[in-house]
UniProtKB/Swiss-Prot annotation:
SS bond partners: 3-24, 6-11, 17-42, 46-57, 58-63
UniProt-recorded Gene Ontology molecular function terms: acetylcholine receptor inhibitor activity; ion channel regulator activity; toxin activity
Chief location category: secreted
Natural source organism: Naja naja (Indian cobra)
Localization terms from the record: Secreted
Stated name of the protein: Weak neurotoxin 6
Length: 65
C-alpha cells in the first residue's frame, strides 16, 4: 500500500506503508477554511477523530488525496 504524506491540499509525496499498515488516512480541522493543513499517512487502524476534526480513511493506493 502507498499513501500520500504531505500537508498541502495538492499532494504528490508518496510513502510505502509498513507491513500491517493497511489504511491510508487524512485528518484536518473542520474550523480552518483558509490555510488548511492536512495530516496524511499510513495506519493499521483508522485514527480516532478528535473534536472539531475530520478523519477520512481508505485502503487503496494514494486514496488519501
Amino acid at each position: 500500500l502507498t499513501c500520500l504524506i504531505c500537508p498541502e491540499k495538492y499532494c504528490n509525496k508518496v510513502h510505502t506503508c509498513l507491513n500491517g499498515e493497511k489504511i491510508c488516512f487524512k485528518r484536518y480541522s473542520e474550523r480552518k477554511l483558509l490555510g488548511k493543513r492536512y495530516i496524511r499517512g499510513c495506519a493499521d487502524t483508522c485514527p480516532v477523530r478528535k473534536p472539531r476534526e475530520i478523519v477520512q480513511c481508505c485502503s487503496t493506493d494514494k486514496c488519501n488525496h
